[in-house]
Regions:
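Active-site loop/oxyanion-hole signature of alpha/beta-hydrolase fold enzymes
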Residues: 54-57, 64, 103-144, 148, ...
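Catalytic active-site module of serine/aspartate enzymes centered on a nucleophile-bearing elbow/loop
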Residues: 300-332
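Alpha/beta-hydrolase fold catalytic core
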Residues: 2-74, 96-99, 139, 330-332
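Flexible "cap/lid" loop of the alpha/beta hydrolase fold
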Residues: 158, 167-199
């Protein structure tokens, strides 16, 4: 084989090897450096006005509360990257309906303090949610949860159903369509248990220059990723330790259906309270088929589909979502 042809055959793989040896570590270092420079805000001192921290098992979580503390409580729990500040409009409507509205930041998101142990399993998160509810001295609550935020909510509901009056789940990401496993880590989970992999990845994902693009990826109505919504999602990303905490949580979002309480399909029919499902018609993250499946598992449930909306109906179709939420609350 001529030497020139041999060189041309070798040049591409050599470039890839050089990129992997030099490019990837350099990119990781730049991402971590950028995160360290960006994440300078102290959580408690920079928390929103009128918010407060309460004990939540092994950490403290931020709570925003509206309305009379004598009124029945509606608790809002966000999904991936979300926090209590997303719910302000819907909290006001909730108060107008005669409830008190309570939005809780569950770690690692928002202003909640990162968990010292790094354990973000949904069962543990469910216990943290229950502990926060106890700290607030709330009983018989309605919980509104979005996306992956529904996983700890379901764990809490199965652990202490007597504390729950009703659930309102918005495009919940529960992973119930997958086969049941022994609960051991998948290959991808195992990979992301290594901090030297997960830390650079989350440092990139939490870069505020990518917030708008990432938000558009999970919604269908791309124009609804407005500057106002983007700023809301960006706000907690400047807090100390954010990307590190999310890197410890990341493997949990990749978990398969195992033997947690909320993984048991037959258990859903035993829930002694109504579950109201709100779903984006065009959701590609948790498709509508999952909503129909979940409705079949539940003994007392309803499913309302938000036209045109994807995985974030509360930001894609805010007026319609507000009316659907108000109707769900008024029916309780």
């Amino acid at each position: 084989m001529p030497a020139i042809r041999m060189r041309s055959i070798l040049v591409l793989p050599l470039k890839w090897i050089l990129f992997c040896v030099l490019g990837v570590p350099i990119a990781a270092l730049l991402a971590l450096t950028s995160a360290a420079f960006r994440e300078r805000g102290e959580r408690v001192s920079s928390s929103p006005a009128a918010s407060k921290y309460v004990e939540a098992l092994d950490t403290r979580v931020l709570v925003q509360r509206r309305g009379s503390t004598d009124s029945p409580a509606v608790v809002f729990v966000s999904g991936t990257g979300g926090w209590s500040g997303l719910w302000d409009r819907y909290m006001r409507r909730t108060v107008d309906l005669g409830f008190q509205a309570v939005a809780i930041d569950l770690p690692p998101f928002g202003y909640a303090l990162p968990v010292p142990t790094g354990d973000y399993s949904k069962a543990r998160q469910g216990r943290r949610l229950l502990a926060a509810i106890d700290s607030l001295k709330l009983e018989h609550v309605v919980i509104v949860a979005h996306s992956i935020g529904a996983a700890p909510v379901m764990e809490a509901a199965f652990q202490h159903p007597s504390k729950i009056r009703a659930l309102i789940l918005i495009d919940p990401a529960l992973g119930l369509d997958g086969p049941q496993t022994d609960g051991s880590d998948s290959t991808l989970q195992t990979v992301f248990r290594h901090a030297w992999i997960s830390r650079p990845v989350t440092a990139i994902l939490t870069n505020t220059h990518l917030t708008a693009a990432l938000l558009r990826r999970v919604i269908t109505e791309k124009n609804q990723a407005t500057p106002e919504w983007v700023r809301l999602y960006q706000q907690p990303l400047s807090l100390q330790g954010t990307s590190k905490a999310i890197s410890e949580w990341l493997p949990e979002v990749l978990s398969r259906r195992g033997h947690a309480a909320s993984d048991n399909l037959s258990a859903y029919a035993t829930l002694p309270f109504p579950v109201k499902l709100i779903w984006g018609e065009t959701d590609t993250i948790t498709p509508l088929s999952q909503g129909k499946h979940l409705q079949q598992l539940l003994a007392d449930s309803s499913l309302v589909v938000i036209p045109r909306a994807g995985h974030g109906p509360f930001l894609e179709e805010p007026d319609l979502f507000e009316e659907v939420l108000a109707a769900a609350l008024s029916s309780l």
